[in-house]
Amino acid sequence: MQGNLLKVLGVLAIVATLVCFIFAALGMIGAVKVGDSCYMRYASDGQGGADSIIGTITLNANANYVNTAKMLSDGTTLLVPDPTRYGEWLNTQVLVENSQPVNLQVVGQVSLCLAYIPKDNLQRTGAGSNLDDNGQMIPIPRINDANNPPVSLIMDAKNNEWRNIAELYANDRVLVSVSPNFANTDATVKDAFKGAEVTQDCSENKTTYNPICGKYSVYSGEYVNACELKEKYWNCEVTWRCPTWHEQIGCDWGALGCVASCKKIPECTTKCMAWVNITRPAPENYLDDGSFTFSWSDNTGKLFIDYSALQCSYNANIPPVDKCPDRVRDRRIKDKDYIGGVHCTSGICSDGDFQKNRRFWYTADGKGGKGPTGLIYQMNDAGSVSQALPSKLEFAKFVADTDQPPDYKGKDGKYLYKVIYNIPFNSNIAKSYLQYRLWSPTSQDSSKNTGGYVLNIKQTKCYRENGNSFNDTFDDRGRVQYIIVKPSENPNTSGKTYSPQGISVDSEGKYSFNANEAGYIWMKILNDPGNNLRDYKDSEGSYKVHFSTSLKVGSFTIKVMNPLLQLFKTKVQGAATSIFKNMVCYKANDSSSCTNFFTYIKAILILYVMTYGAMFLLGFAKINQKELVIRIAKIGVVSGLMNGNTFEFFNNYLFDAITNFSDSIIANMSGYSLFTSTNTISNPFMFLDAVMSKIFFSQTFIAQLLALLSLGLSGIIYFIITFIAVCIVIITALRAVAVYIMAFMATCILIGIAPLFISFLLFDFTRYLFDNWVRFTIRYMMEPVVMMAGIIVLTQLFTIYLDFVLGYSVCWKCALPIKIPFIGTILPIALLNVPIFCINWFAPWGMDYMSGMMGVNMQNIVALVIIAYGMYGYVEFSGRIVVKLTSAVGPSATEIGGKMSHDAGQKVLSSIGMDDKTRQGITGRAEARLKQRNKTLDQAEKNRKNTQKEGGEKTNEEPPKPETPK
């Protein structure tokens, strides 16, 4: 036995080594694709017996997972998405069975389309207003795009219309900012339509500015700047008299007065003073100190001064004429004190409070206020251009400094752009437009305005997060979909039509479902497939989809042992009962097809009684009372079993009791309930279910075993030892099954021919046949019991120590770093621990290749091998025990079962040239070659000695003798 075991161990060691190097080679070339998954030691409910797999995949928004190399102008290459692979499904590498539960959580943000400058925008309106000078649409960078500045749109103050800055879909994110008020410097802005930078002088002391300077004015013409006192300025006193007789005949009647039909003649004898207006062009020159600048306000009353209503005196804007009477009669003081000052009483006066309150300019910085002065916005579902102002104006405000993007500041700490709008578009409306305009009073002619602002925009369009979806111009955009496809299919190339299932996540992005069929889960994000997949191509971002699924490990008992044993036991029991029936012709309609063995037994029994009675009467046979009782009992038993109900008695009471005796005892020893709905024992090997199910059907076990290879050179040794121990247990289990099958078959056959051997009970010279029949029946009944008693205990120990050795969760990750050896002699020591690249492989949960390898308790591995070796040896040992117990010398089920398993193993090994016959042939040929080599060396040595003697050479040293092979 020991020699056979050593041979088996040698073969298993070679196979394990080959498997080790094969998997290592696969890892080196990266041919193993299992996904970024982890096989957990226990399921989420803390129970074992299940493959609990967690994993994470990256689901790209553009549904493109293939990169191609693109040559740049500088000679370098850049990996870019393959232009022909957008909108594809991604294999999650999660293999599920039908009705298997799957839990997932979607985390991340994506933008599923790209924003472009809309029509009728701040800078242009009309047909083609959304196209640049080359006829191309102008893309808007996304908010998280730190490599590209926002798109700048120039707002001219001469435009008094609502214009669009952004087309917004449901859940869009938009970031609108305003360029600063460029003070005493040049301003440079990139014109998005021309694709070139525009630079303008924005220094102070000017009355007109380009819109990019960040300031504007609605004033034009002139305004009253001071008041001047004019003496004798106008004819203030008028008297009326009748025309004289000579001036108009018949008008003056003297004391009687004027004739009513005559017009009186005015006479101005006195001229009065008046305060006249001194005007200046509007607006005043802009000053950087804010002297003529409005502060930010959301009250239009504080944003406009009606200079036309300010007059030094009433009707001061109407000059006098040298006539009597004057054109106006009222030139009283009106706003002189406010304009010129209270204390100024002569000359030109310009010291009033008005001088300090003059305002003409609106600036993008709001003069230190809450936002850009005069900038208003609104939402418009149609995006139409109009001049109508709503009843309530929304004035733009700066967002809090904490919400200002850091990259919007320059190196000097000043804002390059300052955000004024960052509100997500959360609306039930599929689409709307964000519009802006500069406030201007309706009384002013906007065509005479000067200056303007520059608004800048970044927009993340079709924004989705954590797997949520919304309806915009495309229904359900952003919903994560999945299909379950057979392992042999690729939905991207199969040409088949599938029915995707949508995932409706909760607020945390979680979702659970049961697989509706078996296969791999494929996923992608739903987007508009139209317009040549433009939205997919414009998409950006990705989701992290965290999977967790648990599937009960397939039962070795249910899948393998039950079908095998039930089929075998049914066939054997049927054959045994058929033998019994045919021997007694039980219920046989045609007696010609069988011979009733009981007929012969009856004849023998009659002959036995007649002969023995005659001998007793003639005195040839002496018998005492004891012998008489024994002989009568034998005759009674044999004759009692020779009636028509014999088969029913054996079949109903003895047959099942004897054949299932072993199963009942084994079941009680193992502690497992083996009774089915019919209260019959179907499988005595239930104690093997846990360990054999883990070995054959558990993905987690395979991953745990392969993870040993990630522990370095020691891990390879651990793998080989553990693999050999597992193989020994498998072989032992198969040998135990073979022994059980042979014992069961022998028991059934012995019971089937029971009528024959029971008849041997009558005569002393056939008594030994009956005794041996009983011994062998008991032996084959007890042999599986004794064998299983020890294997049950050893199997439980093996299961415990196997969990000690492989009791960890496993992840597919970087496990084997490749470093340059002796790098410390060439490069700085800082590079000693930096890997060049890393091979992904199964590795224990929590193991970091940078911090050293995780150790395994060698004691547990040694114990595992000892237990496996003990199980292998116990099979034959149990057979010897039964032989001693039953004293039944002859072929045992253990020997026959061992021969069966050995022959089966040799048949498998012969395919790879590792069977005993092939190895003996190899060994024999090697020995023959070795003998021939030694013979050749001996002959060469003799020839050398003979040559020396013939040449007469002498030497004091003897030539070395050839080493005798051992």
Swiss-Prot record:
Where is the segment annotated Disordered? 918-966
Spans through the membrane: 601-621, 711-731, 743-763, 785-805, 822-842, 855-875
UniProt KW tRNA-binding keyword: no
InterPro entries with a match to the protein in the record: Conjugal_tfr_TrbL/VirB6
What superkingdom heads the lineage? Bacteria
**Gene Ontology CC, one term:** plasma membrane
Residue stretches of biased makeup (Basic and acidic residues): 926-966
Keyword Cell division (UniProt): no
Q: Which UniProt keywords apply?
A: Cell membrane, Membrane, Signal, Transmembrane, Transmembrane helix
Question: What is the annotated signal peptide range for this record?
Answer: 1-24
The membrane topology term of the UniProt record is:
Multi-pass membrane protein
The molecule here is called Uncharacterized protein RC0144
